[in-house]
Amino acid sequence: MILTVCLSPCTDITIELDSLNVGRTNIVKSKTLSFTGKALNVAIGVARLGGDPYATGLMYNENGYMFENALDKEGVPFTFIWNKGRVRENYKFIDNKSMLTEVNDVGEEVSEAKTGELLNMVQMLSARSNVTVVSGSLPRGVPAEYYGRLFRAMDPKTIKIADAEGARLFSALDAGVD
């Protein structure tokens, strides 16, 4: 099994316009919603390639069911630690010149109790995993050192992969990744 840990899921809202005119009314040509997060994308990719994925991480009460529906459609089993609030939304505006403008949400804060629950979940699930992938950003209020705590909680037999940058990556490297 390949376990993926998503700490900050997001709804990507891609809006195509003839041109993006700041301060004016713009007409949408097309709009696409994607229920993502780097680790969830990994799990979906593993499923599409015929592998054995399992997704876990943090999810939010108000709109998390849309992520469950998307993972069900892709054949990805999952267990999430549920939090109050909404999944963050990232907006991508594409104009007819193929210029991309992004506006990314920071999302909801997560309590220390919930991050502790996730540590326990990762410890349990990683014992059944050949590979464990932690990928993406952290929710507001969760320090970069949490990446290291996750890797230290993992079963020593699982192959540990971090897809991160900056302080999160250094925290994972200090904890030991493969």
Give the label of every model feature segment.
Residues 42, 118-121, 146, 150:
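A general structural detector for well-ordered alpha-helical segments in enzyme core domains, enriched
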Residues 131-178:
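Conserved beta-alpha-beta core of the PfkB/ribokinase-like small-molecule kinase fold
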Residues 3, 54, 79, 133, ...:
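Structural detector of well-ordered beta-strand residues that form the stable sheet scaffold
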Residues 1-56, 65:
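Glycine-rich phosphate/adenosyl-contacting loop at the front of the ribokinase-like
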